Amino acid sequence: MEEEVAALVIDNGSGMCKAGFAGDDAPRAVFPSIVGRPRHHGIMIGMGQKDSYVGDEAQSKRGILTLRYPIEHGVVTNWDDMEKIWHHTFYNELRVAPEEHPVLLTEAPINPKSNREKMTQIVFETFNAPAFYVSIQAVLSLYASGRTTGIVLDSGDGVTHVVPIYEGFALPHAISRIDMAGRDLTNYLMKILAERGYSFSTTAEREIVRDIKEKLCYVALDFQQEIQTASQSSSLEKSYELPDGQVITIGNERFRAPEALFQPSVLGLESGGIHATTYNAIMKCDVDVRKDLYGNIVMSGGTTMYPGISDRMQKEITALAPSSMKVKIIAPPERKYSVWIGGSILASLSTFQQMWISKQEYDESGPSIVHRKCF
């Protein structure tokens, strides 16, 4: 491989797709992982209506479209739409010819094997990439924080996972995955806003609620205390202007929605909260590495961006951990993109260049080669 060709790094999140060039310090393109199709057939001839829209364009025309996310809980559920998103990434966002660049994609841990095989197949057969690699998202986040040992709590739009990593290797027996993340919090916020009399139901309106969540929600340090404060005064209330100019007020919903991260039972889920899941994952690891994990709890992903989340996590884990243990939560300000940044670092390392799966190897072995070369 010649040095001058930059690898493409694409972090396909359930909610947002982050794409750019290896060696850059931030992704060039960040757009919603959405494919929208018109709800009604166009009546005006010559309007140039397309049969599908991707990303920001789908978002801006959402009023007339049905929006679909091809990635659910970190797993691709609709490959045709996924192909559209990749096509859009290469040709419209990055403006590159994929057959000229190695491609690094990311995936959630404990994803079905068939998922990575299909990814490999599409990259080589549809887009003719010269080389390909797929990497676990949490491991990349850890690289981005400059560590090789730590436990990563990665929570995006579709899936949350806790991954203990020692000297660069994920410890598979201790990985935990919770199928609860940003999208579920958005749905929950829709539900509790409905109790206030604000009804949001369509796929387009869900995007409004997502915006409310991102702008106004926070994590309470003490949930009961905060509920009390909210009921006694209006100091926690904030107003939000809807696209049609109507102004709505939201109060305790601001911290009730993200509280589901610590109490998934409010969503009807059996799993423990993110604090308990992190603690249990540490306890599944060898007793000698636990100290290093407690001292390096790294947060990554957009759902860890709520104000107050690190303090609450610190409080909850400290309560569970042995009393003498030093607990440290690392929440880098750029954690929304840390998976992508880690991918950019990895793909530009000179030692990584022999790790790529080449087109030739793929032609010889088929999609299953991905299990041998990427771990």
Curated annotation (Swiss-Prot):
Kindly state which keywords UniProt assigns to this record, in alphabetical order: ATP-binding, Cytoplasm, Cytoskeleton, Hydrolase, Nucleotide-binding
- SMART domains assigned to the protein according to its UniProt record, in alphabetical order: ACTIN
Q: For this protein, what is any one GO molecular function term? A: hydrolase activity
Q: Which reaction does it catalyse?
A: ATP + H2O = ADP + phosphate + H(+)
Question: Which cysteines share a disulfide bond?
Answer: none
Instruction: State where the protein is found.
Output: Cytoplasm, Cytoskeleton
Q: Which Pfam families match?
A: Actin
Q: Which GO terms describe its cellular component?
A: cytoplasm; cytoskeleton
Give the superkingdom in one word: Eukaryota
Q: What is its main location?
A: cytoplasm
Task: Give the Enzyme Commission number.
Answer: 3.6.4.-
Q: Which family does it belong to?
A: Belongs to the actin family.
Function recorded in the entry: Actins are highly conserved proteins that are involved in various types of cell motility and are ubiquitously expressed in all eukaryotic cells.
Q: What is this protein called?
A: Actin
Provide the taxonomic classification.
Eukaryota, Fungi, Dikarya, Ascomycota, Pezizomycotina
